[in-house]
């Protein structure tokens, strides 16, 4: 039980699975009763986000009674969160997950992982982004037999490989360094559990595969 158990919430997202997992994880951890508010701006509104206007159909989906909490995540979700913040006022505590790339005034609280550079009086940081894996869930997963993983020798190393994004690009040197590190650990007796992203460059995936 948390002090917010049973409070109402709207989760405002762009529909991306990674964004929704973060918003849902926070809502569940707080014990909120939540509803989804997905936005999909098009044309100029999408290009201007997070600075542009709220979606044209905002008034159809964002109407009183206002929720106790609103959690927004994703660049294109920020205009809707900003407008809700202004309309609901003190009735709704607003939270922006990840760097909203706009004014601190967009929400009551901005929550970013430490690797983001965003800092401010209403900004909090955690080592990583929020997620849905609670201690209870992790304990259950550890205790659940898994034939493939259980056969791997220890130590076991999890390698989660992302990909190129607007703020960062995988270089050939990055791929070589990652592959070299995996090869070195493998020579020391480690086994690996590797997952890639849809944005992982093929050259990186190939380099890692060859190093295993």
Q: Which sequence ranges carry the predicted segments?
A:
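Extreme N-terminal starter segment of soluble prokaryotic enzymes
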Residues: 4-10
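Phosphate-coordination loops involved in phosphoryl transfer and adenosine-cofactor binding
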Residues: 6, 67, 154
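Active-site and donor-binding regions of nucleotide-sugar-utilizing enzymes
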Residues: 11-131
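Short hydrophobic segments within beta-strands
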Residues: 12, 97, 160-162, 195
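A nucleotide-sugar donor-handling region in carbohydrate enzymes
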Residues: 105-173
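Short hydrophobic signal-anchor/transmembrane segments that target glycosyltransferases
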Residues: 174-189
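Catalytic donor nucleotide-activated moiety binding site of glycosyltransferases and closely related
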Residues: 189-212
